[in-house]
UniProtKB/Swiss-Prot annotation:
Signal sequence coordinates: none
PANTHER family cross-referenced by the UniProt entry: CARBAMOYL-PHOSPHATE SYNTHASE SMALL CHAIN, MULTIFUNCTIONAL TRYPTOPHAN BIOSYNTHESIS PROTEIN-RELATED
Domain Glutamine amidotransferase type-1, residue spans: 177-361
Sites where the protein binds L-glutamine: 45, 225, 227, 253, 256, 294, 296-297
Region CPSase: start-end pairs: 1-173
Family listed: Belongs to the CarA family.
Gene source species: Methanopyrus kandleri (strain AV19 / DSM 6324 / JCM 9639 / NBRC 100938)
EC number(s) recorded for this UniProt protein: 6.3.5.5
Gene, per the UniProt record: carA
Residues at the catalytic site: 252 (nucleophile), 337, 339
The name this protein goes by in its record: Carbamoyl phosphate synthase small chain
Reaction catalysed by this enzyme: hydrogencarbonate + L-glutamine + 2 ATP + H2O = carbamoyl phosphate + L-glutamate + 2 ADP + phosphate + 2 H(+)
Length: 361
């Protein structure tokens, strides 16, 4: 089968379908990582999005059993230049094509991903549809663009409830006792906490502050997740109540939630930061780290001036806020992903810093 990808600016490309023969819609974004397609596909922060990989070949090592960041493919659709159909890693269980088929997610191959990336970089992330079709039944351009016009904007989607756990569960035993508010948490975050001896309990995004304090945690992590942080009012209110009661760390969406909880504001980035090569400067240490990132929203630095939040990390490329520290309470947050998954391990020490804070308090 064939497939078409249509963007809201009128761009339409045709290619070969792989994965599931169903239609997909969402915000079309790009990731600049050279490897890590499995981690990207299973990252809950990609819910509601059609993902373009800028590196040309994808699928060349197959799907490995221990690598996924969640139990399912989270992207709505997958766009690649070349789909590898040859030998895969000896430990791989299935191919990328089979993986997407199993999870009901369509992909399109054989398209100019460089052109698409340049367009999104210039014009910004935009709505799109991925439509499979038989070669003798190609949809018209107007039909495709009409479908695009019906796609909701990412800020109109309630995505966190779709990816958050529905019931509290225990991930690991140990000390200090950490509660993770699941807004779409990646497994790598839980693994990094457990690796350092922490006891980890995961709770739904809408768990109240009182319910969390009843667990008697030594610290709370507000996880990554998809979409606009202003759509998760319950989590913002919970964090507002927890500040000062227990040490807090936010990651990615959790960074934005901490900012909103203290009266800051967020805004949508033009095309977001998605990849494993984002340089971030730590103003406290006067050092630059290469980080893994996946977000389309950011904290407005001007909105933080009258709040108890101090900017500690900034993006070297565009100057956006990459993390804040609370000046009156044991709390901080980072916009980047210290756990990587995929990406560099330069900032895994952030977990050590947080757990030390939990032990001190």
């Amino acid at each position: 089968m064939r497939a078409a990808l249509a963007l809201e600016d009128g761009t339409i490309v045709h290619g070969e379908l792989f994965g599931s023969p169903r239609e997909a819609e969402g915000e079309v974004v790009f990731n600049t990582s050279h490897t890590g397609f499995q981690e990207a596909l299973t990252d809950p922060s990609y819910r509601g999005q059609i993902l373009i990989m800028t590196f040309p070949m994808q699928g060349n090592y197959g799907i490995l059993p221990e690598v996924g960041e969640s139990d399912r493919v989270q992207v709505e659709g997958f766009v690649v230049r070349y789909l590898h159909d040859g030998p895969i890693h000896p430990r791989a269980e299935i191919t990328l094509d089979e993986f997407l088929q199993d999870h009901g997610v369509p992909g399109i191959a054989g398209v100019d991903t460089r052109m698409l990336t340049r367009k999104i970089r210039t014009e910004g992330a935009m709505r799109g549809v991925l439509v499979p079709y038989e070669p003798d039944d190609q949809p018209s351009d107007e039909e495709l663009l009409e479908r695009v016009r019906e796609v909701p904007h990412i800020s109109e989607m309630d995505l966190v409830p779709q990816v958050s756990v529905r019931e509290e569960y225990r991930f690991s035993d140990g000390k200090p006792e950490i509660v993770v508010i699941d807004c779409g948490v990646k497994r790598s975050i839980l693994r990094e906490l457990a690796k350092r001896g922490a006891g980890v309990t995961v709770v739904p995004y809408d768990t109240s502050a009182q319910e969390i304090m009843d667990i008697d945690p030594d610290g709370v992590v507000v996880s990554n997740g998809p979409g606009d942080p202003k759509r998760v009012r319950e989590t913002v209110e919970t964090v507002r109540e927890l500040i000062g009661q227990v040490p807090l760390m936010g990651i990615c969406l959790g960074n934005q939630i901490l900012g909103l909880a203290e009266g800051g504001d967020t805004f949508k980035l033009k095309f977001g930061h998605r990849g494993a090569n984002q340089p971030v400067k730590d103003l406290d240490k006067d050092r630059v780290y290469i980080t893994s990132q996946n977000h389309g929203f950011a904290l407005d630095p001007d909105s933080l001036r009258d709040t108890p939040l101090r900017v500690r990390w900034v993006n070297v490329n565009d100057g956006t806020v990459e993390g804040v520290v609370h000046t009156d309470a044991p709390a901080f947050s980072v916009q980047f992903h210290p756990e990587a998954g995929p990406g560099p391990w330069d900032t895994k020490w952030v977990f050590d810093e947080f757990l030390a804070m939990c032990r001190e308090h």
